[in-house]
């Protein structure tokens, strides 16, 4: 292999053998025959086919090999002078210069920026990359990179409906098949991101696709490319340039504000060419429009010269113009040919300028020139239009002054003329009158008509002509117009008054709005001419609406309306100078005057607007007071149930739950619902919040302060009651009953409800009044309702109380109420089984079994009975208090009965009090061996049903009382509890009328019931009786009450069974007589005896300390009860068959 020697040494051309060696070296260094650490596919097992990056050492070796071993380039013999050749540096500089020159080439007919300027604007001193993968660069147009275009989930979230792929097949390899199932329309543009690529061929197609996408319902289009900075951005910019008439820089910056884009030089150059093309097209369109306008101005110039020539012959000019105008008045004025429009506009301008003869002659020369030039060409037409505009600009101020003077002069002439000429001046049929009458008045009239109609047409023309670019001048002119119209108004209204009596059907009074605009017609026309290229059609429309918004109403009302209506309006409006009207009233008057339907009386009424407002205020105040009075009367009627309670409904209102039901706790410590529904014994004891006395007369006014004070009192009492209930809820039930009991011990029958309220209010000390509990009772009444008083007979119960504060009843929880009602019904059902067992025991009380056991069990039962009595009382009462119906539990009903008994017989109440005190002192002794005197009517009621039940059922006690003793009980209780029937029925009446009537049993039954009840240790917030002293004796915590589902019929039946079936010495015959009276209700009770008897038996056996032999007695009782049950069922079946 040849090696290189000195620089001057002659190089030897290698032979073929050496050349092969060189190639071998090249293959070694320039190709990697096997994978190497530099190979792109170094992990591949196959031989690399790629050119590898050459390592530095390999590069040095290769260079040395090439320099030494390969044949050098032969020296060319230069035919040219070496100085004439360009060096590489020169070539590079030239190439750079050419590129920069292309980028800086800003040669353009439309000042299109060069590519370099566009790039500088896009980079903004630094080149940025897009921050987001996708950006919304135009409403519903998104530019995104490749990752977004292939993410179907993201496309769905974006709501994309169209996709324009600017790199279809050249970077973003998607297609319409890729988006199947997404309901996406796809368009792919196959373009590489190189400057030499021609993307302009896709501009139109892509722009049309984008436009179609945005026109679809909820259309959103995604334009994607590899990076979303060049190809996709160029297509969006082309769309903005084509369909939104944006210049190239504006379109690029619109996109750049939303996303960093950087199209390559070639794309920018093609966008620049597109901009030039679009600008050229738009210029051609504008040129066509201008040529059309020039043709119109040529026609206008022709008409101008003709009109000036006709001015010499005033009669022919006036008649012709008035004929033309009269015919045009009846036409629709919005659509007019170009020739007619130009003619009218110029005539309007001429009339507004009021040229003198010299000016007319001077104009005639110029316009005759323009007439001849119209045949030759369009040279003089532009000059004519410009001259018209310049004349208007130079004379606008002078014209305004002249217009005012001309107005005044015409007014004076009109006033001087006769009535007939005045009338003709306002008619629409001047075309016929102009030929027959050629007076000066007619000429003036025709000029005015022309001016008015032309001004109106000039207004219509303003829709198609451009208007001024600012609003200020028009606002000033409007103010001046209004002032002039106001000045004209009074003299015109006087004239119309004179003409009013003789008005004709065809007559027409020109309205002040018309007159106010007459002088402005030429001004408006010239504004249109001067500024026609400065405003958009929308702005022109706004100008028209502001300046001439009444044009249609004017033409319709003015043409069709007679003088009579307008004169009437004027006569009515005569009053308006002295009237201070609101903006709305002024507008209404103007509107009525336009349509010719003004109402004098309405105007006069408007002048009395202040009185009307006062009357409305007074009426509103009266309505408010009447509403308040009705509300208060309803509240009073709620509180005055005594007057008509016999006819009142016996059902408990749902609103009665509202005040206390939500506050009842799970263990039923409070009887707030019972207190809510508590039936007051005497309405006089109800110190409810007094209602304000209100006069009834419709003209009267009531003091709002009194109503507010009353409402404040109501709220305060309600809040106090709620606080008391919360306090009571936090105490155990035994404490509540213990506190309630002593307070109730010494109270009379009328104060029993106050005991209940005392317990509810947390044992508040009774204030010193005639009755110590009257104020507590008022607290109760404030939360609850005014309760009804029972009438003399047992069946008549005045209806349930209706809460006076029903406005606080919005918080009723119906679900909670339903749940509590179900619990109460379950309690009643289980209670029924207990009652049936008690009945069974009473039926068999004369048996030797009971007699044998009674003496021994009395002592054992005394303590247990009290406990169980307390439990039963609280359990029964808990549920009855929770739900609105006061369930006829024995204890509650007995206490109620005694309260009624006291209410109706005060002496017996006093006797009861003394008996209770005596009984309290020696309760245990009495319970161990109750003497017969203790069983007198007042003290007999101390045994609760539950105690009797346990005596008879749980302990299998055979009663020691003889028949005479039981009869004694009955008779004595007849004496003491004459009202018991009433009480019992009254208690049950809180639930239903039927229950109330069912509770009328024989007095003996009731005496037993109430006597047994009197002993019940109910918590005193439950009892309405004075005997709650039992609660003192049974402070043990009450056992959880039994939940017993039962129907409302069960409630009634239970109330019946409560009173009929349990007594210290109850005879089954008595209860059976009552069951015969009640029929099917008794049947239901008997049916349920079997259902719950065994469960209740075991429960009561467990609750008392019994001896083993009692179990045998229980079995005997059960056998006897089953036998009794069978007999009862057979009897009931017999009765049913009968």
Swiss-Prot record:
SUPFAM superfamilies: (Phosphotyrosine protein) phosphatases II (SSF52799). One of its GO terms (molecular function) is protein tyrosine/serine/threonine phosphatase activity. Keywords: Cytoplasm, Phosphoprotein. It holds the Pfam family DSPc. Residues 386-409, 552-567, 595-614, 965-977, 1035-1059, 1074-1091 have a biased composition (Basic and acidic residues). It is found in: Cytoplasm, Myofibril, Sarcomere. Residues 773-788, 936-947 have a biased composition (Low complexity). Gene3D superfamilies: Protein tyrosine phosphatase superfamily (3.90.190.10). The modification Phosphothreonine is found at residue 427. Residues 316-331, 672-687, 878-897, 980-992, 1095-1106 have a biased composition (Polar residues). Residues 132-280 form the Tyrosine-protein phosphatase domain. The keyword Ribosomal protein does not apply. GO terms for cellular component: sarcomere. Belongs to the protein-tyrosine phosphatase family. Non-receptor class dual specificity subfamily. May be required for myofiber maturation. This is Serine/threonine/tyrosine-interacting-like protein 2.
């Amino acid at each position: 292999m040849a090696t290189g020697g000195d620089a001057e040494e002659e190089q030897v051309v290698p032979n073929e053998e050496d050349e092969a060696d060189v190639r071998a070296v090249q293959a070694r260094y320039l190709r990697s025959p096997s994978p190497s650490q530099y190979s792109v596919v170094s992990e591949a097992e196959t031989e690399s086919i790629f050119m590898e990056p050459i390592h530095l050492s390999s590069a040095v070796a290769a260079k040395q090999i090439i320099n030494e071993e390969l044949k050098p380039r032969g020296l060319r013999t230069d035919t040219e002078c070496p100085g004439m050749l360009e060096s590489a540096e020169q070539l590079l500089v030239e190439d750079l210069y050419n590129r920069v020159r292309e980028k800086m080439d800003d040669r353009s007919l439309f000042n299109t920026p060069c590519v370099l300027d566009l790039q500088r604007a896009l980079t903004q001193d630094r080149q940025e990359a897009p921050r987001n993968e996708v950006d919304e660069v135009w409403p519903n147009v998104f530019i995104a990179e490749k990752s977004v275009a292939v993410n179907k989930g993201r496309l769905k979230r974006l709501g994309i409906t169209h996709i324009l792929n600017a790199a279809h097949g050249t970077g973003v390899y998607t297609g319409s098949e890729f988006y199947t199932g997404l309901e996406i329309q796809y368009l792919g543009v196959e373009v590489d991101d190189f400057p030499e690529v021609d993307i302009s061929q896709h501009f139109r197609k892509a722009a049309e696709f984008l436009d179609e996408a945005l026109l679809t319902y909820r259309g959103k289009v995604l334009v994607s490319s590899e990076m979303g900075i060049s190809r996709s951005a160029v297509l969006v910019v082309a769309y903005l340039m084509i369909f939104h008439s944006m210049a190239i820089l504006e379109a690029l910056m619109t996109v750049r504000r939303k996303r960093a884009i950087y199209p390559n030089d070639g794309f920018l150059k093609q966008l620049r060419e597109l901009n030039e093309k679009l600008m050229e097209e738009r210029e051609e369109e504008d040129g066509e429009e201008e040529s059309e306008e020039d043709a119109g101005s040529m026609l206008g110039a022709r008409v101008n010269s003709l009109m000036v020539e006709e001015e010499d012959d005033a009669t022919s000019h006036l008649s012709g113009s008035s004929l033309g105008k009269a015919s045009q008045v009846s036409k629709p004025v919005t659509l007019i040919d170009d020739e007619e429009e130009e003619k009218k506009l110029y005539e309007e301008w001429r009339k507004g300028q009021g040229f003198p003869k010299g000016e007319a002659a001077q104009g005639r020369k110029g316009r005759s020139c323009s007439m001849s030039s119209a045949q030759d060409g369009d040279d003089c037409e532009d000059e004519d239009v410009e001259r018209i505009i310049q004349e208007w600009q130079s004379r606008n101020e002078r014209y305004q002054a002249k217009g005012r003077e001309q107005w005044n002069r015409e007014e004076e002439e009109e006033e001087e003329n006769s009535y007939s000429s005045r009338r003709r001046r306002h008619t629409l049929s001047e075309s016929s009158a102009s030929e027959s009458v050629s007076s000066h008045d007619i000429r003036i009239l025709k000029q005015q008509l022309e001016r008015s109609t032309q001004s109106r047409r000039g207004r219509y023309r303003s829709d198609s002509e451009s208007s001024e670019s600012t609003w200020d001048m028009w606002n000033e002119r409007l103010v001046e117009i209004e002032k002039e119209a106001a000045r004209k108004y009074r003299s015109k209204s006087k004239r119309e008054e004179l003409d009013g009596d003789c008005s004709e059907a065809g007559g027409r009074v020109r309205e002040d709005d018309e007159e106010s605009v007459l002088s402005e017609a030429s001004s408006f026309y010239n504004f249109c001419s001067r500024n026609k290229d400065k405003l958009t059609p929308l702005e022109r429309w706004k100008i028209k609406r502001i300046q001439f918004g009444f044009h249609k109403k004017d033409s319709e009302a003015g043409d069709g309306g007679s003088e009579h209506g307008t004169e009437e309006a004027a006569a009515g409006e005569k009053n308006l100078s002295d009237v201070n009207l609101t903006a709305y009233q002024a507008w209404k008057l103007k509107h009525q005057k336009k349509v010719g339907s003004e109402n004098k009386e309405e105007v006069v009424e408007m002048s009395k607007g202040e009185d009307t407002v006062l009357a409305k205020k007074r009426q509103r105040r009266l309505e408010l007071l009447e509403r308040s009075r009705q509300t208060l009367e309803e509240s009073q009627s709620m509180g005055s149930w005594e007057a008509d309670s016999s006819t009142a409904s016996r059902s408990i209102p749902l609103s009665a739950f509202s005040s206390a039901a939500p506050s009842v706790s799970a263990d039923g410590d409070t009887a707030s619902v019972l207190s809510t529904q508590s039936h007051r014994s005497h309405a006089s004891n109800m110190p409810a919040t007094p209602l304000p006395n209100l006069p009834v007369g419709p003209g009267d006014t009531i003091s709002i302060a009194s109503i507010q004070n009353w409402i404040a009192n109501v709220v305060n009492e309600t809040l106090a009651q709620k606080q008391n209930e919360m306090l009571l809820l936090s105490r155990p039930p035994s404490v509540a009953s213990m506190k309630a009991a002593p307070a109730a011990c010494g109270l009379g029958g009328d104060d029993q409800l106050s005991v209940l309220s005392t317990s509810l209010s947390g044992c508040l000390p009774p204030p010193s009044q005639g009755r110590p509990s009257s104020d507590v009772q008022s607290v109760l009444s404030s939360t609850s309702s005014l309760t009804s008083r029972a009438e003399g007979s047992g069946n008549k119960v005045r209806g349930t109380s209706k809460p006076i504060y029903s406005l606080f009843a919005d918080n009723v929880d119906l679900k909670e109420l339903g749940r509590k009602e179900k619990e109460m019904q379950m309690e009643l059902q289980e209670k029924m089984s207990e009652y049936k067992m008690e009945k069974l025991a009473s039926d068999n009380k004369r048996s030797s079994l009971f007699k044998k056991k009674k003496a021994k069990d009395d002592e054992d039962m005394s303590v247990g009975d009290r406990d169980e009595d307390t439990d039963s009382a609280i359990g029964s009462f808990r549920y009855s208090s929770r739900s609105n119906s006061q369930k006829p539990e024995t204890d509650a009903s007995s206490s109620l009965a005694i309260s009624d008994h006291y209410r109706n017989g005060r002496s017996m109440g006093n006797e009861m009090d003394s008996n209770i005190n005596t009984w309290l002192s020696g309760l245990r002794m009495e319970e161990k061996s109750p003497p017969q005197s203790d069983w007198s009517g007042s003290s007999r009621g101390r045994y609760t049903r539950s105690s009797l039940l346990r005596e008879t059922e749980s302990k299998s006690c055979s009663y020691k009382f003889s028949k005479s003793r039981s009869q004694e009980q009955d008779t004595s209780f007849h004496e003491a509890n004459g009202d018991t029937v009433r009480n019992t029925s009254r208690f049950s009446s809180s639930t239903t009328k039927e229950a109330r009537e069912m509770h009328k049993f024989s007095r003996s039954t009731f005496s037993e019931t109430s006597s047994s009840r009197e002993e019940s240790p109910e918590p005193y917030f439950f009892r309405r009786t004075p005997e709650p002293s039992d609660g003192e004796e049974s402070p043990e915590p009450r056992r959880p009450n039994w939940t017993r589902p039962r129907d409302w019929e069960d409630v009634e039946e239970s109330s019946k069974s409560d009173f009929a079936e349990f007594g210290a010495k109850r005879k089954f015959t008595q209860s059976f007589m009552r069951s015969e009276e009640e029929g099917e209700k008794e049947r239901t009770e008997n049916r349920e005896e079997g259902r719950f008897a065994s469960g209740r038996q075991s429960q009561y056996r467990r609750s008392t300390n019994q001896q083993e032999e009692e179990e045998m007695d229980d079995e005997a009782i059960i056998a006897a009860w089953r036998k009794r049950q069978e007999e009862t069922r057979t009897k009931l079946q017999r009765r049913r068959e009968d």
